[in-house]
Amino acid sequence: MIDRQNDNLFDLVAPYEPAGDQPAAIETLTKNFEAGAKAQVLMGATGTGKTFTMSNVIKNLNKPTLIISHNKTLAGQLYAEFKQFFPNNAVEYFVSYYDYYQPEAYVPSSDTYIEKDSSINDEIDKLRHSATSSLLERNDVIVVASVSCIFGLGDPREYQNHVLSLRPGMEVERNDLLRQLVDIQFERNDIDFQRGRFRVRGDVVEIFPASRDDHALRVEFFGDEIDRIVEVDALTGEVIGERSHVAIFPATHFMTNDEKMEKAIESIKAELAERLAVLKGEGKLLEAQRLEQRTNYDLEMMQEMGYCSGIENYSRHMEDRQAGEPPYTLLDFFPKDSIMMIDESHVTMPQIRGMYNGDRARKQMLIDYGFRLPSALDNRPLTLPEFEEHVNEIMYVSATPGPYEAEQTDIQVDQIIRPTGLLDPNIEVRPIMGQIDDLVGEINDRIEKNERVFITTLTKKMSEDLTDYLKELGIKVRYLHSDIKTLERTEIIRDLRLGKFDVLIGINLLREGIDVPEVSLVAILDADKEGFLRSERSLIQTIGRASRNEHGQVLLYADKITDSMRHAIDETKRRRTIQEDYNTAHNITPKTIIKPIRDAISMVQSVEHPEEIKMTNEIDLENMSKAEKLEMVERLSEQMRLAAKKLDFEQAATLRDTILELKSEID
């Protein structure tokens, strides 16, 4: 067991002070939580600095914080931002560690069994271990997570009970320490020294913690006593410093002991006998034979090796839980007085709600056809009510909060003023009759002013037809759709900003990374067709694309004003009025955001000259030779590794996609 530090303070480091609506929002949110509020909504318009407000609230409350985002990319962006704001505290990243994951499944119509197949990202596994160990060691922890945080993770009590605490002067036999390391799933390897392994050289034991990728621990013995503990560079062996105490956490989150394993095996055998009787009673002899064969094989593996493939399906037995009881998750590693923040809650909360049902439907099929025992259903994500039971204090953050948030709390704090003084755009509704000719006139006006245009349509065909029509008129236009690869997509956005073309057409321009300050006009065609792409929230998010430019305008082409349109227009007008009044009172003139235009493939800071950011020349794939492409792959691979080391996962992922596309070009 280890004692948790509870007296650390969050130290917010930022080159600017709160501005606009931020000071009032920070004060209100903090005071409400301190007064006992359990749930609040931060309704922050695009570009108002919601992350900075969240950081200030974390600093004021000084509690361990879990921030949940709806995808890995956004979680990576938030992680990087919070790392900058809190360089002296533990900011951790917890997302699914699978690069590739094919879940186990059975398709009865074609009698096809699909084996589970996965590829684990070692870097993310390290970060997950870092997150859980930080939560047990200290109180000044921020964990940025994806929805994977509601999936089973193992019992935190077992994890904590297996922590090895070592100090110089402590009496312990070297061989006893080696046995303890094996018990907590460390592997001995005297040659290939990496995460989760240890090696032995005489009276010296070197341990590579699962939460590190560069520093190892060297434990030096004198007889049966620990003489010295030093932290060393895992690659060079150079001593970094002496340690008076170290806590070595298990190499896996799924810890158990021999007694629990024996009990679990007996429990699995009992369930198997019960299930076989049911299947045979229903005349399902093939299913019964299949289940008996598969389960007995798994039991043999567990008895001999302490492990089997797909052991997570027996997690209920391993953790001694009752049927239907919720699994342990990352949320159980947080102390009771923690705070939760849900980023883009209008998307994230429906995701959390939907995880359980999707998982159950797939598993039920495996159980019905004799591939798994019914207890496999208890290896699952949390249900929404179970998730809510873990909530102490929660803050929903969104530009367009959903109905769930409204049900949970009536406390909504608005953040509408942008520190830049920029206003929400003007909105005009125009008739569908003659919409294209009207739009062409507006496009030409913007081209004369060297500004850009977004057009969003409802169908792929309409996008393609409109693109062809505008090209015939001599307008420089591109079409952005889901088939476009990552590299090409970032280059299209960059070319739009550079003015290589003036109009970008797409179906759903809400995706991250399409914030282009040069865009002064957003045209929404068929705005009165109710549906997902024309809902109130989608319209507000799309309207927000024009809020980065001082001349921002939105045209809604529609023959009638739907409820969604009315609400979106009213909300935008309300925000704009508040922003105008604030600017007048404080004598602020809105200025378009100046955002540097980087190459689609840009050099990460070089190791030799970290102060320099080197840009590659524009890449012309069509005219590059094979040798040049191979050289480019090598250079980009180096940049990708460097970006991952600097924890810039968004950049690393972009570079990875670029490398894959270059390789496919070469092949």
Swiss-Prot record:
InterPro entries: Helicase/UvrB_N (IPR006935), Helicase_ATP-bd (IPR014001), Helicase_C-like (IPR001650), P-loop_NTPase (IPR027417), UVR_dom (IPR001943), UVR_dom_sf (IPR036876), UvrB (IPR004807), UvrB_inter (IPR041471). GO terms for biological process: nucleotide-excision repair; SOS response. CDD domains: DEXHc_UvrB (cd17916), SF2_C_UvrB (cd18790). Keywords: ATP-binding, Cytoplasm, DNA damage, DNA excision, DNA repair, Excision nuclease, Nucleotide-binding, SOS response. A motif (Beta-hairpin) lies at residues 97-120. GO terms for cellular component: cytoplasm; excinuclease repair complex. Residues 435-597 form the Helicase C-terminal domain. ATP binds at G44, A45, T46, G47, T48, G49, K50, T51. One of its GO terms (molecular function) is ATP hydrolysis activity. Residues 31-414 form the Helicase ATP-binding domain. Residues 630-665 form the UVR domain. It is found in: Cytoplasm. Its main location: cytoplasm. The beta-hairpin motif is involved in DNA binding. The UvrABC repair system catalyzes the recognition and processing of DNA lesions. A damage recognition complex composed of 2 UvrA and 2 UvrB subunits scans DNA for abnormalities. Upon binding of the UvrA(2)B(2) complex to a putative damaged site, the DNA wraps around one UvrB monomer. DNA wrap is dependent on ATP binding by UvrB and probably causes local melting of the DNA helix, facilitating insertion of UvrB beta-hairpin between the DNA strands. Then UvrB probes one DNA strand for the presence of a lesion. Forms a heterotetramer with UvrA during the search for lesions. Interacts with UvrC in an incision complex. Belongs to the UvrB family. This is UvrABC system protein B. It comes from Latilactobacillus sakei subsp. sakei (strain 23K) (Lactobacillus sakei subsp. sakei). The lineage of its organism: Bacteria, Bacillati, Bacillota, Bacilli, Lactobacillales.
